[in-house]
Amino acid sequence: MSSLNQDQIKTLEQSRQRLIQLTHSLASLITSLNQSDPLPSWTSLQSQATIISNNLLTISDHLSDNRDLLSNIVAYPDASYPSRVPANNVALEQVLRTKLDPRVEDWVARGRRAGAPTTSSDAGAGALGQYQTSSGQRLLSDDAIAELWDWAPVAANEEARKRNWGGNYTLEEREMGIENVVTGLSRVLEDDDEEDESDSEEGEGEADEMEVVGARRRSGAGAGLEFDIAAANTGSGANAGAGAKVVAPVVPLDEILRFMTTGAVPGQR
């Protein structure tokens, strides 16, 4: 192979930098696991795992994009390389190594076996879009997977529309009658529609029963007026007033409007 040009040298340098980043990320994770007492939190481990995963993806994409160059390049020591130094011999042996480390070779073999079904051609796929791997596992072909993904969103949406999400009963149970539903619970479930209606009625009633019953000037340096608000007495007769808290007379609406426009305190004109 002829000498490398600047672009090829840049590609090799990028490979080196990415591998260094991955090595530092792995070393940081190993150090935190070995030296931390107690062990790092799950969030810290997840963050480190995410960094390592991103580094692996970056290296994988880089190696795939430059596969032709990296597979054809040949490494050899220059005459000026100090190979007589023992420390340099270790690095030289790693660079000139033609076979992978046994452990790495096992990892690569397992990865290729795991990725083989997804890269297999659809030739020989059965009528149902399935084919059988060398290990006997039956998998869907690429066309069958694409067809499945086209069908799944529509089918899931149609099924979701049939459900009463967040309720105590499904639409099928309501059609059959909720009195016939066996929930297995010791408590009695209430109908959601009736509960929603009662909540809305209570909310409207509470909003109508609030009245301004008094006003006084705010104490301290802050200027302004404070209004006393209490529940209105909606009952009639002696029974309605029994047990009710006696409150100050209601401030007329025109008094409140006059205070808002002129600043005159209610009752002091």
UniProtKB/Swiss-Prot annotation:
Q: Where in the cell is it found?
A: Nucleus
**Comp. bias intervals (Acidic residues):** 190-211
Tell me which InterPro entries the record gives.
Mediatior_Med8_fun/met
Question: Keyword set for this entry?
Answer: Activator, Nucleus, Transcription, Transcription regulation
Q: Which Gene3D superfamilies match?
A: 1.20.58.1710, 6.10.250.2610
Question: What is the name listed in the Swiss-Prot or TrEMBL entry for this protein?
Answer: Mediator of RNA polymerase II transcription subunit 8
Q: Name one Pfam family in it.
A: Med8
* Keyword set includes GTP-binding: no
Q: Does the keyword Nucleus apply?
A: yes
Where is the chain membrane-spanning?
Answer: none
Biological processes per GO annotation: regulation of transcription by RNA polymerase II
Report the record's disulfide bonds.
none
Q: Where is this region: Disordered?
A: 187-217
What function is annotated for this protein? Component of the Mediator complex, a coactivator involved in the regulated transcription of nearly all RNA polymerase II-dependent genes. Mediator functions as a bridge to convey information from gene-specific regulatory proteins to the basal RNA polymerase II transcription machinery. Mediator is recruited to promoters by direct interactions with regulatory proteins and serves as a scaffold for the assembly of a functional preinitiation complex with RNA polymerase II and the general transcription factors.
- Record the organism: Aspergillus niger (strain ATCC MYA-4892 / CBS 513.88 / FGSC A1513)
Q: Name one GO molecular function term.
A: RNA polymerase II cis-regulatory region sequence-specific DNA binding
Q: Which GO terms describe its cellular component?
A: core mediator complex; mediator complex
Query: Which family does the record assign?
Result: Belongs to the Mediator complex subunit 8 family.
**Subunit notes for this chain?**
Component of the Mediator complex.
